[in-house]
Design a protein with these regions (language model features):
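The feature marks the mature, well-folded catalytic cores of soluble enzymes
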Residues: 1-281
Length: 281
């Protein structure tokens, strides 16, 4: 069995930055909570919890003396206002790429542009981005939605940072035809594009493709979609225990990639389990 691990697998810059900030708080014994799970990976969230960093869903759950950490997905301006009004200290771990989108949205919407976000309406990053708009917001998950929407005459279009480029491009084609005055900003994260391109290449050359990551992670699910287009035997593995004993045959080419919220220690554990299973077959 030949095993290959993608060079771009695992934590992206924004997630790595947020996790480091959280563990720094734990080391300093600073009472700190994250507003929502810091990352979409249950194993890493549990590791943070054991270090003393718990997750809350609302500001009402924050105890006196605790600091709130904003996760890499970012939040709406209203969250910052509420924290200030309640006297809650904030550590802002919003990914700089996401923060840049916030500023674009605020700037263009203040000048009268509607805002089109290509992404998933219920994703926390998209919810946060939409909150920075001062006017009309359209959230379009795909080209079909773009065809059906009552679009404005003038708009800024941005992308959820983890959206697949082909999906963004398909929506963009519709917008170019239907929105006369369109400002385009391709805000897909470079790391996301690199990871997806690498996953395409690896899955096209592999007999078995393993995507390591949380089942609730949007970018992990998108990686799995990408891999399944080129490799029928593509599987999602959240923990080493999820690795099927009969995953691969002795002469199979196996490739691994991981979502942006997947820590390298977990990727290594999955790799070790695959190799261990191969030895016992």
């Amino acid at each position: 069995m030949k095993l290959t691990i993608g060079e771009h697998a695992g934590f992206c810059f924004g997630v790595r930055r947020a996790v480091l900030k959280a563990f720094e708080c734990a080391e300093k014994q600073l009472p700190c909570v994250t507003l929502g799970p810091l990352i979409h990976n249950p194993q890493e969230v549990e590791r943070l919890r054991r270090a003393g960093i718990r997750s809350v869903e609302t500001l009402d759950e924050v105890k006196p003396g605790e600091t709130v950490m904003i996760r890499s997905h970012g939040v709406t301006p209203d969250v910052y206002r509420q924290c200030e009004a309640r006297g809650i200290p904030v550590i802002d771990a919003t990914c700089p790429h996401v923060a840049h989108i916030h500023q674009l949205v605020r700037q263009y919407s203040e000048h009268g542009d509607a805002v089109v976000i290509v992404g998933e309406a219920d994703h926390p990053e998209v919810v946060g981005i939409a909150g920075w708009a001062r006017g009309r917001v359209f959230i379009l998950p795909d080209a079909q939605a773009a065809e059906q929407a009552e679009l404005p005459q003038k708009a800024l279009v941005v992308a959820q940072t983890t959206i697949r480029r082909d999906r963004f491009d398909s929506v963009l084609q519709v917008l170019r035809r239907r929105v006369p005055d369109l400002t385009e900003r391709i805000t897909i994260c470079a790391a996301t594009s690199q990871r997806q391109q690498e996953a395409e290449k690896l899955s096209g050359e592999a007999d078995v493709m393993v995507v390591v990551g949380g089942r609730n992670s949007s970018n992990t699910q998108k990686l799995l979609e990408t891999c399944r287009l080129r490799c029928e035997r593509s599987v999602l593995v959240e923990t080493p225990e999820d690795v099927p004993p009969d995953l691969a045959e002795a002469d199979d080419r196996v490739a691994l990639t991981a979502g942006a919220s997947t820590p390298l220690w977990l990727l290594e554990q999955v790799r070790a389990r695959i190799e261990e299973n191969a030895k016992t077959r």
